[in-house]
């Protein structure tokens, strides 16, 4: 599903469709896309404290906007899959991670 959506987003970038929200984001540029990613990430956090259906909807919105960001930056989805595969099975402990207050 994510691959299909990503391919559709890339298609919109090369073959714009009038009235397309995806094309609106591409036309507005990177700053607008980044703003939307930030907004959607915040909405995910808020939704997680509320209703599961709301959380599902907001995670879906965030995933879409992240895919738009990847397409804008010409980063193939396979690059994310490769990075996640590199991390698979690696042992990580809490002491290897910075405390949230230290960020």
Curated annotation (Swiss-Prot):
| One Pfam family linked to the record | PRA-PH
Which UniProt key words apply to this protein?
Answer: Amino-acid biosynthesis, ATP-binding, Cytoplasm, Histidine biosynthesis, Hydrolase, Nucleotide-binding
Q: Where are the transmembrane segments?
A: none
Q: Which reaction does it catalyse?
A: 1-(5-phospho-beta-D-ribosyl)-ATP + H2O = 1-(5-phospho-beta-D-ribosyl)-5'-AMP + diphosphate + H(+)
Q: What is its EC number?
A: 3.6.1.31
Q: Name one GO molecular function term.
A: phosphoribosyl-ATP diphosphatase activity
Which superkingdom heads the taxonomic lineage of this protein's source? Bacteria
The molecule here is called: Phosphoribosyl-ATP pyrophosphatase
What species does this protein belong to? Listeria monocytogenes serovar 1/2a (strain ATCC BAA-679 / EGD-e)
């Amino acid at each position: 599903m994510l691959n299909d959506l990503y391919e559709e987003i890339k298609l919109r970038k090369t073959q714009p469709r009038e009235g397309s929200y995806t094309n609106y984001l591409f036309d507005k540029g990177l700053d607008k896309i980044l703003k939307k990613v930030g907004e959607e990430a915040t909405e995910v956090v808020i939704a997680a404290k509320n209703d599961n259906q709301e959380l599902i909807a907001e995670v879906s919105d965030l995933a879409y906007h992240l895919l738009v960001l990847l397409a804008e930056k010409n980063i193939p989805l396979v690059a994310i899959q490769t990075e996640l595969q590199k991390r698979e099975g690696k042992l990580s402990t809490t002491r290897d991670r910075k405390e949230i207050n230290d960020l």
